[in-house]
Design a protein with these regions (language model features):
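Asp-based, Mg2+/Mn2+-dependent phosphohydrolase catalytic module
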Residues: 2, 6-10, 16-132
């Protein structure tokens, strides 16, 4: 995952974590896993006053990131909170990370794409970076 985050940084793509965990827990996790310098912003449900899939956490992330254009990617593992929330609330392209204990969303929770390894997503990002 760190290689993917390095690629995003080199391409100048802003990144944010949008989480339902409390700020204290999320900040500790990010530091523990050595990811603190990879993300530009962390938005918690505590800050937003609502849990995902409410639009507030997503909107706060967009306000902080101020992305160029209207191409937003939401990468998450929860079909309802991340995938449907990202698509319905901020019109994001949705990418679902599949790992043990998760299933690909169906119906209104279906992602635009699903992946199991971050290297798969990294190859896609690099191809898109070559085109841009």
């Amino acid at each position: 995952m760190k290689e993917l985050l390095d690629d995003l940084r080199l391409l100048g793509i802003p990144t944010a974590i949008v989480t339902d965990l409390t700020a204290q827990i999320q900040f500790r996790k990010v530091v523990y896993f050595g990811l603190d310098h990879y993300f530009d912003y962390i938005v918690t449900s505590e800050e937003a006053g609502y849990d995902k899939p409410h639009e507030a956490p997503f909107q706060i992330a967009l306000e902080k990131m101020r992305p160029k254009g209207n191409c937003i990617w939401m990468i998450g593992d929860n079909p309802v909170n991340d995938i449907r929330g990202g698509r319905d609330k901020i019109n994001a392209i949705t990418l679902q990370k599949i790992h043990e204990g998760t299933v690909v969303g169906t119906g209104e929770n279906i992602p635009d794409a699903a992946f199991t390894e971050f290297n798969d997503l990294r190859r896609l990002v690099n191809r898109l970076g070559d085109v841009a």
